[in-house]
């Protein structure tokens, strides 16, 4: 059973990469991840600007352990360039797995491009096996990472927004020219224009596209209309939660669609990240088109020890299905998902009711969109009756029926 991955020249013993996050701020974390079987490690994001306000932040994370999710975020650390250099240098003395350095790519200026390129060169010299350019787009402004820009939490707008994809393209070209190691590009789902960004990345010769980062939103269940004062996520050490809080299972709904979208749009290998909480999600990400996966929240909640269970579950699944390698099921979902309605071929069908099963509950007659010019389903003599001329063939009623009395059949 072969679960190895070749990713931009890196030899990974399995598809589990530790994503950039607060789980990657010191050497002990990297050593522990390697011990439990991580294939590679990406360090916490580095802000290469001296005195950036984001560097003084502190980690604040509330966890819902039963739901296997983060309940709230109120802050996270950043590394300065010197800290990132030290971490990479120390890690390469202690571990054998590939270790990459995450570097933020912020404001679309020539000065920023030069700063990022210089930082990448320095981290490469310290032994980084790859560089990950964290192209968060408008997010650094939202985070208020710099002193002059972003204190109000406003997004990029106007000319700055228009320049960002081109800026990313030029920065990647500059970094690729400056270093002789693979360069990854990380995308945020809250970015200005994800399709334009990944296209710019591929055009610039990026080696791997990391799709992606935490999403804008609040975790389900955190709003209590009866106790609005608890909106802070039960934090003792913070008075608010961050709106960039979509992680775990909730984030995976977005990440899988973006992985598929990226797989349809570019040929560059994709590192699938976002809501990978167990082996099943690794399989799903690979079936969505990912070459490998990056995991963060699951480790923040349950520790690196779950890597062993992830690998065991993956191998067991492959044995049960008869897969010898990851390539055999990579991308299986890609052609089953369309990006636009125009890509989908629909068939003329109508709803058929099995009156022996029908209880006459009337649920099938309630959907507001039912019918061409009037409702296609009526309840007559305590049974659902379909007017085939009015039936849209939408299949909603078949899914609603608690008795499974409705099936869809092709029109002759």
Q: What does each model-identified segment do?
A:
Residues 66-165:
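Active-site beta->alpha loop and helix N-cap motifs at the rims of alpha/beta catalytic domains
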Residues 1-99, 104-111:
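N-terminal capping/small domains of soluble enzymes
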Residues 135-166, 197-264, 268, 302:
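Glycine/Thr-rich beta-alpha phosphate-binding loop at enzyme active sites
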Residues 363-382, 396-411:
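Iron-sulfur cluster-binding cysteine motifs and their immediate structural context
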Residues 64-97, 155-185, 235-269, 310-323:
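Alpha-helix-loop-beta-strand connector modules within alpha/beta enzyme cores
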Residues 53-66, 218-248, 286-287, 298-323:
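C-terminal helical cap(s) of enzyme catalytic domains, especially alpha/beta-barrels
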Residues 43-49, 132-137, 208-219, 275-276, ...:
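Glycine-rich phosphate-binding active-site loops on the catalytic face of alpha/beta enzymes
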Residues 28-32, 114-125, 191-204, 264-265, ...:
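Catalytic cores of alpha/beta
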């Amino acid at each position: 059973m072969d679960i190895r991955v070749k990713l931009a020249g890196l030899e990974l013993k399995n598809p589990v990469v530790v994503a950039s996050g607060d789980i990657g701020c010191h050497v002990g974390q990297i050593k522990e991840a390697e011990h439990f079987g991580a294939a590679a490690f990406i360090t916490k994001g580095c802000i290469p600007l001296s005195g950036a306000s984001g560097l003084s932040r502190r980690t604040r994370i509330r966890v819902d352990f039963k739901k296997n999710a983060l309940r709230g975020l109120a802050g996270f650390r950043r590394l300065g360039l010197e800290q990132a250099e030290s971490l990479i240098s120390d890690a390469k003395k202690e571990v054998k797995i590939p270790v990459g350095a995450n570097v933020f790519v912020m404001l679309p200026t020539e000065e920023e491009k030069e700063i990022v390129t210089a930082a990448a060169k320095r981290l490469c010299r310290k032994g980084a096996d790859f560089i990950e350019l964290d192209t968060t787009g408008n997010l650094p402004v939202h985070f208020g990472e710099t002193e002059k820009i972003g204190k109000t939490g406003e997004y990029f707008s106007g000319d700055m927004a228009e320049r960002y994809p081109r800026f990313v393209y030029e920065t990647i070209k500059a970094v690729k020219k400056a270093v002789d190691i693979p360069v990854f590009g990380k995308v945020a789902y809250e970015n200005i224009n994800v399709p334009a960004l990944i296209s710019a990345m591929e055009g610039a010769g990026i080696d791997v596209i990391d799709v992606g980062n935490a999403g804008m939103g609040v975790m389900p269940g955190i709003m209590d209309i009866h106790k609005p004062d608890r909106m802070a996520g039960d934090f003792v050490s913070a008075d608010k939660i961050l709106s960039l809080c979509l992680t775990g299972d909730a984030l995976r709904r977005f990440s899988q669609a973006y992985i598929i979208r990226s797989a349809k749009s570019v040929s560059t290998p994709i590192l699938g990240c976002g809501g990978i909480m167990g082996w099943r999600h690794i399989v799903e990400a690979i079936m969505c088109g990912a070459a490998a996966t990056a995991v963060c929240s699951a480790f923040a909640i349950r520790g690196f020890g779950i890597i062993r269970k992830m690998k065991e579950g993956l191998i067991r699944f492959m044995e049960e299905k008869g897969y010898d390698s990851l390539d055999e099921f990579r991308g299986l979902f890609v052609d089953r998902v369309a990006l636009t309605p125009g890509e989908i071929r629909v068939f003329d069908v109508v709803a058929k009711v099995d009156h022996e099963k029908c209880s006459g509950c009337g649920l099938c007659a309630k959907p507001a969109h039912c019918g061409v010019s009037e409702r296609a389903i009526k309840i007559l003599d305590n049974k659902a009756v379909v007017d085939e001329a009015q039936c849209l063939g939408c299949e909603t009623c078949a899914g609603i029926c608690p008795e499974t009395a409705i099936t869809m059949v092709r029109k002759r």
